[in-house]
Amino acid sequence: RIVAMADTHNRHAGLAVPDGDVLIHAGDLTGRGSLPELDQVAEWLRSLPHPHKVVVAGNHDFALQRNPVAARALFHGLTFLEDSEATLAGLRIWGSPWQPWFHDWAFNLRRGGEIDAKWRLIPEGVDVLITHGPPLGFGDLVDRGEKVGCEDLLRHLERVKPRLHLFGHIHEDRGEWQYGPSRLVNCTTSEGELPVTVLDLP
């Protein structure tokens, strides 16, 4: 059982977090991305009973990009993924924090070659893909009626074919979709206002 969340933005204390085998946070743990904020969230995650806990950064989590050595050290006892893989509970899990550039937030890259180079790193055969942002057309609809997901990521989904793709970033379009063999889930909690997502993989 996978328990997933994103976009808690420091508002994690009131969340009801069900039990499961793997707990995943798909980024935007904080509001301003400071080391004290990250430390507080990491401590909270360690207090939860799940045997495996995976974290990917989001665009608000600045210290993980600007001061990565100090920031990552805060996540001892947790699995922090940045364009990297871990096998937990028999699942190959890949995590990546990047999203298409938007107002110079953390982990922003230009659409096309810059961000495509990151998606090319995702290996085929992963069971669970975690990205902070959505692919184009799934969980990416914002209030102004525009789909803002990453078309390059969508193309690599067709190549990688993960069993499960978890993301957040777009608070307005939480939900679940099927794309070929892949189950796509926007697991945002929208600053702690929405419940944590619980998923069973067959």
Residue map of PLM features:
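Active-site-proximal beta-strand elements of phosphoester/diester hydrolases
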Residues: R1-H9, A26, G90-Q99, D127-H132, ...
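Core catalytic region of metal-dependent phosphoesterases/phosphodiesterases
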Residues: M5, N10-L88, C187
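Catalytic metal-binding/acid-base residues of hydrolase active sites
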Residues: H9, L29-T30, N59-D61, P97-Q99, ...
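Short amphipathic alpha-helix with an adjacent loop that forms part of the alpha/beta core around
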Residues: G14-D19, T87-A89, D116-P123, L199-L201
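Active-site-proximal segments of metal-dependent phosphoesterases and phosphodiesterases across multiple
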Residues: T30, L35, F102-H103, G125-K161
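Charged helix-capping and loop-helix junction motifs
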Residues: L38-A42, A70-L78, R110-I115, R144-L154
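Binuclear metal-dependent phosphoesterase catalytic core
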Residues: E85-A89, D152-V160, L164, H171-P202
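Binuclear metal-dependent hydrolase catalytic cores centered on His/Asp/Glu-rich metal-binding motifs
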Residues: L91-V128, E146-D152
